[in-house]
Amino acid sequence: MSQPSSDTQRQPAIVILDFGSQYSELIARRVRETEVFSVVLGYSTSAEELRRMAPKGIILSGGPSSVYAEHAPLCDPGIWDLGIPVLGVCYGMQLMVQQLGGVVEAATGKAEYGKAPLEVDDPTDLLTNVDNGSTMWMSHGDSVKALPEGFVRLAHTANTPEAAVAHLQRKLYGVQFHPEVVHSTCGMALIRNFVYHVCGCDPDWTTAAFIDEAVALVREQVGDKRVLLALSGGVDSSTLAFLLKKAIGDQLTCMFIDQGFMRKGEPEFLMDFFDRKFNIHVEYINARQRFIGKLEGITDPEEKRKIIGTEFIRVFEEESKRLGPFDYLAQGTLYPDVIESAGTNVDPKTGERVAVKIKSHHNVGGLPKDLQFKLVEPLRKLFKDEVRKVGRSLGLPEEIVRRHPFPGPGLAIRILGEVTDEKLDCLRDADLIVRQEIKEAGLYHDIWQAFAVLLPVRSVGVMGDKRTYAWPIVLRCVSSEDGMTADWSRLPYDLMETISNRIVNEVKGVNRVVLDITSKPPGTIEWE
């Protein structure tokens, strides 16, 4: 399988070196919100490689390690002599201090976790427009005991004397808090200060610029070859369809494989929307029985994902021979998909970065090794909010742009355990009620995802003076900005009551509705 080459090839203005923080990608997203392109690289990226990339700034992420630990992850010390501005965040600040001759130790007093008011001592370029007393998010058990030569304090908190520091002449900055999280009220002001005032970046990472570059890169990669797109009807594949149509016109063929795991009425909606309303021809393939047959007796969620992903590509290969030839397979893979399928962390025993696979993503984890297509994935460096902006700019209607995310394997991973036709019918009806009621309440666009999950157990109930023994449905509603982290949505009680009453009365085989109040982390948004 060839590696995708349709990422944007522009050099990043800001490079984030990742030391294992759960917020590393969030830092990248915040920088991009300032219309400055950023990427996340491993902490071991050499100073020479960074010199060749020539970013205007470097950000060192936080991380779970202690800089004085035996196998602590370290950056190339040559970074300090590149003449490139550096901002260290939490662990990144401590690493900067230690490598440049300062002292970092375990906090002797009270460790600082959560919100803390920041007292600004020196409103330099980094802290311009950062209000004195503004709330910042702390999460550290170590602290700076002595600053390196040439460094000065910029701000402090009640428990952290060196909450923000700098070597002003060398443009080396460190903050002990996390400006990237929403809890830091002036965090974005600080990030903008670093990006614009310290680094001198230009705000040129715009939707229009991305579209122009992506179109040019797709044309360069594909040439006069034909491209086959797996169209699902979600915002990702729909945006991709519009982008590819703009780039290569009739060289694009969209194929919708109905694997039987879509939500109620979606196959019909999809065909009408693209084929008739927007004149983008879609080949409809009914493969419902083929997919359900492959999942017979399968209960392991990872195996289900891989079977669906493999079978999906097999159908593509077969249909491409009938409709083709095609050289490229287009996929709507996004940045969080890649991260979640092969996340990285630091092994505290060895200091090495290791893969921590949470779950295979349908686009990137279930592909067979003998894939006959080359991949074109022009969206794989975008976050979901960026994809929505691209979709709007390309003319995609709000009905599609603001649809809730839906996993590639569909309802098959919202049915825990074995997937059957009976369970699919049950879940479709329950899921439709959830979405109908949330839309009726005017909350659909305030929620990241809202859906139903069918559990592989039965519970006792009483309906019409008779004992029932039926499946429970889980109501899963979460709020998020990008899907990387999420909190459970606080729905009104009367809305939850309406949803529950409708499901147990209208959906055959269900006698109980429960609410999932787990955030991500520790849970994931989907149950499988």
Swiss-Prot record:
ATP binds at S232, G233, G234, V235, D236, S237, S238. It is an enzyme of class 6 (ligase). It comes from the Bacteria. GO terms for molecular function: ATP binding; GMP synthase activity. Gene3D superfamilies: 3.30.300.10, 3.40.50.880, HUPs (3.40.50.620). CDD domains: GATase1_GMP_Synthase, GMP_synthase_C. It catalyses: XMP + L-glutamine + ATP + H2O = GMP + L-glutamate + AMP + diphosphate + 2 H(+). Its EC number is 6.3.5.2. GO terms for cellular component: cytosol. Pathway: Purine metabolism; GMP biosynthesis; GMP from XMP (L-Gln route): step 1/1. InterPro entries: Class_I_gatase-like (IPR029062), GATASE (IPR017926), GMP_synth_C (IPR001674), GMP_synth_GATase (IPR004739), GMP_synthase (IPR022955), GMPS_ATP_PPase_dom (IPR025777), Rossmann-like_a/b/a_fold (IPR014729). The active site is at C90 (nucleophile), H178, E180. Residues 13-204 form the Glutamine amidotransferase type-1 domain. Residues 205-403 form the GMPS ATP-PPase domain. Keywords: ATP-binding, Glutamine amidotransferase, GMP biosynthesis, Ligase, Nucleotide-binding, Purine biosynthesis. PROSITE patterns: GATASE_TYPE_1, GMPS_ATP_PPASE. Catalyzes the synthesis of GMP from XMP. HAMAP family: GMP_synthase. NCBIfam families: guaA_Cterm, guaA_Nterm, PRK00074.1. PANTHER family: GMP SYNTHASE [GLUTAMINE-HYDROLYZING], GMP SYNTHASE-RELATED. Homodimer. This is GMP synthase [glutamine-hydrolyzing]. It comes from Synechococcus sp. (strain CC9605). The gene is guaA.
